[in-house]
Amino acid sequence: MWVLGIAATFCGLFWLPGLALQIQCYQCEEFQLNNDCSSPEFIVNCTVNVQDMCQKEVMEQSAGIMYRKSCASSAACLIASAGYQSFCSPGKLNSVCISCCNTPLCNGPRPKKRGSSASAIRPGLLTTLLFFHLALCLAHC
């Protein structure tokens, strides 16, 4: 029961007037062949307090690499990325990888020669965030 109390407290903090949270992401809703949608014309402002993450989907096909990027809610993004995890084999034909991140323009081009991105959400954290989101929803039902 104390978990719901904590969840309600966090909900109150995030939904206070004046504390609107908005993130910018790269967005190309239709798959783009060999175009990673990372130029300025693909930058969009996501829906305030609803779409709090950026999502990137990469499909490797015989014709080339297909990209789709968008804003997403944390729940939708985490569910999609977890659902496709078994299909993600970078460098292999028909691989489908979906990743989520929560910093501005984080679904854009990869940084040159650096380690893994600190903003990328790790698989163990996916479950924690999903359960936290469910607790928040239960607190408001």
UniProtKB/Swiss-Prot annotation:
Gene null: resulting phenotype: Increased anxiety-like behaviors. Increased glutamatergic activity in response to nicotine in layer V neurons of the medial prefrontal cortex.
SS bond list: C25-C54, C28-C37, C46-C71, C77-C100, C88-C97, C101-C106
Signal sequence, start to end: 1-20
GO cellular component, one term: membrane
Localization: Cell membrane
Lipidation (GPI-anchor amidated glycine): G115
Entry comment describing in which tissues the protein is expressed: Preferentially expressed in the nervous system. Expressed in embryonic and postnatal postmitotic central and peripheral neurons including subpopulations of motor neurons, sensory neurons, interneurons and neurons of the autonomous nervous system. Expressed around the growing nerves in the limb bud. Expressed at high levels in specific brain regions such as the prefrontal cortex, amygdala, hippocampus, mediodorsal thalamus, dentate gyrus and specific brainstem nuclei (at protein level).
Keywords: Cell membrane, Disulfide bond, Glycoprotein, GPI-anchor, Lipoprotein, Membrane, Signal
A Pfam family of this chain: UPAR_LY6
Main location: membrane
Name the UniProt record assigns to this protein: Ly6/PLAUR domain-containing protein 1
Organism, as annotated: Mus musculus
Lineage: Eukaryota, Metazoa, Chordata, Craniata, Vertebrata
Name of the coding gene: Lypd1
